[in-house]
Amino acid sequence: MKEFPKNYNFTENEKKWQQIWQEKQIYAYNPNVAKEETYVIDTPPPTVSGQLHIGHVYSYTQTDFIVRFQRMMGKNIFYPMGFDDNGLPTERLVEKQKQIKAYNMDRSEFIKICEEVVESEEEKFRSLFNQIALSVDWSLEYQTISPLSRKISQMSFLDLVQKEEIYRTNQPILWDPVDGTALAQADIEDKEKTSFMNYITFKTAQGDPLTIATTRPELLPACVAVFYHPDDGRYKHLAGKSAITPLFNEQVPLLADPLVRQDKGTGLVMCCTFGDQTDITWWKTHNLPLKTIITKKGTIDFQHETSIDGLKIKEARTKIIDILKEQELLIKQEDITHTVKCAERSGAPLEILTVPQWFVKTISHKEELLKRANELNWHPKNMKIRLENWINAISWDWCISRQRYFGVPFPVWYSKRVGEEGKILYADVTQLPIDPLKDLPVGYSKEEVEPDYDVMDTWATSSVSPQLSTHGISDDFAVNKDRHDKLFPMDLRPQAHEIIRTWAFYTILKAHLHQNTLPWKNIMVNGWCLAEDRSKMSKSKGNVLVPEKLLEQYGSDVIRYWSANSKLGADTTYSEDVMKNGKRLVNKLWNAAKFVFIHFDKLKGEDKKASLLDIKEKITNEFDKWMVNKLVELVKLATNELQNYEYANAMHLTEKFFWVVLCDNYLEISKTRSYDEEHKNPQGQYSSILTLYHVMQTLLKLFAPFMPHITEELYQILYSENSIHVKGSWVNYSDLNYEINAKGAEGLLEILDIVRKFKAEKNLSIKTPIKLLEVSGIVLSAELAEDLKNVTSAEEIQFEMKDDKIKVNIIL
C-alpha cells in the first residue's frame, strides 16, 4: 500500500501537473476524429494592449470549465489560443511603453518595434494561461498579425469584394483627431460633457435678424444652410429666402425639414459640413455643397480675417465666441450638459470628415442579422437583447479603413496607367498575404500603381477569428478547405458582454456574408470582474488586482473556485471571503481523501477496477444505497447544468453535496462500519468502503473542471495513473438506482440533526454517550438503527409510531 502524502503543497503540485499535462499532450486536438464528435471553441484572442489583470482569469477560466466538461464527456476538443496583436490598441501600447509616436517615425521601423513588444507581451499571457490551467492546445495558437492570419483576413476582404458586399467611397466618416484615423460606429462611446448653447444673430438676405442656437460656433465658416421645421409657424415666412452668416457673410438657403426640433434652441438650426449625423442627412437630402474646414489633426483650415486658421477646435471656438461678443452678435449663452461622441480608445471628441474609405455593407442586412441573433443559442438568454438593440441602432455601414500602421494591409493598389487612372487593382488570391507598399499587382510596374496606405480595422480581422483557426473563408477562398469544413461553424463563442456590439456582431455579420450561416451554435457571455466596492477595476483608481500575487497566495484552483462562484453573465466582485472558502475546500478535499484512502486496501482489486454499476450488488447496506442514489442524482443534475453552460450551479451542487452529504453526514455515519475494528459486520464494512471509493472518485470528477490540480493529484493517489482530465472520463450513472424507501435514511439524518443540536446547546462533545434515544414518528430498519447508534454514541434506541412528525427524547 502506497503512502498518502502528509500535506498538499499547491505551489509544487500545480507546476508539476501543468508540466505533465503538456508533456503527455492531455489536451491535444485529434484531427482524425469525426466532426460530430468534435467540440470547437472560438477562443477570445486577448488584445495585446496592456497589463494582465484578474478579469482575464475570471473570463477565461469560465470557458475552461465548459471545455474540460465537454472533453470528459467524450468530445474531441479543438481549443486554440490566439493573440489579437494588430491594430490601434497595440499601437497605443507601444507608443506608451516606448514613449514614441508612430507618425514621427519611419513606418517600417515602428512596425518592427510593435512586433518586438507584442512578442514579449504574448509570453506573459502564455505564462498566466498555463498557470491558471487553461486546457488549450498550444499547437493551435495563432496571432492576428501573422502571415497566415493576414492571408485569411485579406481573403475575407477579396471574398466580400467578389460578393459586392464591400465598397470604397468618399463620404463622411467618424474621425479620431488624436489617433489620426477613421473609426466605425462600434468604436465610439457617448460621453456627457458640459458646454454652452450659444444664441447667435444671423440675418436674412433682406436684413431681418434671425437667432440661431448652436454648441459649435467654430463651424460657422462651414455653414451651408439654415433649417426650420415645416410646421413651425414662426418661420414659414422664410420659405424660399436666404440667410447671411455672421462674420463670414456667406449667403445660404433657408430650408424646411422635419428633422428640426422646434423645442430646441430657437427652432432655427444651422447645417454645417459636418457637426453631426443630422448635418450629413441634410447635406445628402438637400444636395448641399461641401465646405471642409477641419483637418485630420483636428485643427481649422480656413483663411480669414478672424485668424482661426491653424487653431485647434476648442481654441477656435473660444476665439469665435470672443469675436461674436465684440461685434454684439452673441445674444446669450446657456450652460448645458450634452452627449458628445468620443473615441472609445483615445477618449477624444470625434469629428466628421470626408475621406475615401472602405466599407462593409451593414445597414442593408439588418433584418437578416436580427434573424441570425434569434437562431443563436444564447447563454444566458437575456444577453440576446444587447445584440438586437445594437443592430436596430446601426445607422452607418461598417468603415473598415484605418489610417494607421501595425495592421493587416488592404490587398489593393490604384492604377496610374494612362487611360485607367484611379482604377482599383486587387491582389490575386495566389499572392496573399501581400503588402501593397512592397508588392505589386500582376502585370504592373511600381511606377504604374499607387498602393493603398491604410490598414484594416482590427475588428475586420478579429471578426474572422473562427476562420483564423479553420484556415478558410468560403468555398472559393480557403487555405485548407477540408479543415475549414470540418471545424466551421464552431460550437462555442465565449466572450464578454461589452463587446457583443463589436466582436459578436462583426463575426456574425462576416459568417453571414461569407457563407450564409452562423459562425457558431452557442455564445457564452461573461460579465465583468469588479473591485470589492463594485466599481470597475482601473489602474487610475489603483484597484486592479494582479493575478500573479493571488496565484502565489492561493494557487490556481482557489482562484478558479472564486471564478466558478459567479453565475454566467453576471458582474462579480473580487472577494477574499470566497477565496478563503476555496482554500478551505481544497484542504477539506485533501483530508477527506486521506480518510477514505486508509480503507481502500481492504477492497478487492477487481472491485476497484469495476464500474459502480458492475459492483452494484456488493453495496448492501441501506444507508449506503441511499448515498449512491443521492450521488446518481447529483451527477444527473450537475451534468445537466454544465450542458446548459450553468457552471456555477454545477459547482454549487457538487460543493454542497461534498460538505453536507459526504463530510457532515455520510463519513460520520459510516465511520464505525468502515473501521469495524471488532469485525462485527464485514459485509457492512465492505459496503461502506466500496461506497466511499466510488463517491470520492465521482466527486473528484465533478470537481475536476473547476479545480484541475487538486483533483488530478488525489485521483492519481487514490485511483489511477491515467489523468482524470482525459477524453471520456466523465461519469454516467443513468441506469443505476437502488429501489429503497428514502424516508428511512432521511429520517436517520433528521434524528441525527436533533441530537447534534441538543449536544451543542449543552456544550457537549458529539461523542458524549447517550443512554437512551426515544424516537417517535418513525421506525428505522435494523441497519439504519445500528448506524444511528454508532454516530450518536447511543447505548439504546427505542422507536414507536405514535406521532406524525419525528420527535426525539434524549436520556444521558
Curated annotation (Swiss-Prot):
Pfam short name (any one): Anticodon_1
Protein name (database record): Valine--tRNA ligase
Single Gene Ontology BP annotation: valyl-tRNA aminoacylation
Cross-referenced PROSITE patterns: AA_TRNA_LIGASE_I (PS00178)
Keywords: Aminoacyl-tRNA synthetase, ATP-binding, Cytoplasm, Ligase, Nucleotide-binding, Protein biosynthesis
Organism: Rickettsia africae (strain ESF-5)
The keyword Metal-binding belongs to this UniProt entry's keyword annotation: no
Binding site for ATP: K539
Molecular-function annotations in GO: aminoacyl-tRNA deacylase activity; ATP binding; valine-tRNA ligase activity
Motif 'KMSKS' region, residue range(s) on this chain: 536-540
Main location: cytoplasm
Matches recorded under CDD domains: Anticodon_Ia_Val
Function: Catalyzes the attachment of valine to tRNA(Val). As ValRS can inadvertently accommodate and process structurally similar amino acids such as threonine, to avoid such errors, it has a 'posttransfer' editing activity that hydrolyzes mischarged Thr-tRNA(Val) in a tRNA-dependent manner.
InterPro entries: aa-tRNA-synth_I_CS (IPR001412), aa-tRNA-synth_Ia (IPR002300), Anticodon_Ia_Val (IPR033705), M/V/L/I-tRNA-synth_anticd-bd (IPR013155), Rossmann-like_a/b/a_fold (IPR014729), tRNAsynth_Ia_anticodon-bd (IPR009080), Val/Leu/Ile-tRNA-synth_edit (IPR009008), Valine-tRNA_ligase_type_2 (IPR022874)
GO cellular component, one term: cytosol
Gene3D superfamilies: HUPs, Isoleucyl-tRNA Synthetase, Domain 1
Domain of life: Bacteria
Localisation per UniProt entry: Cytoplasm
Comment, domains: ValRS has two distinct active sites: one for aminoacylation and one for editing. The misactivated threonine is translocated from the active site to the editing site.
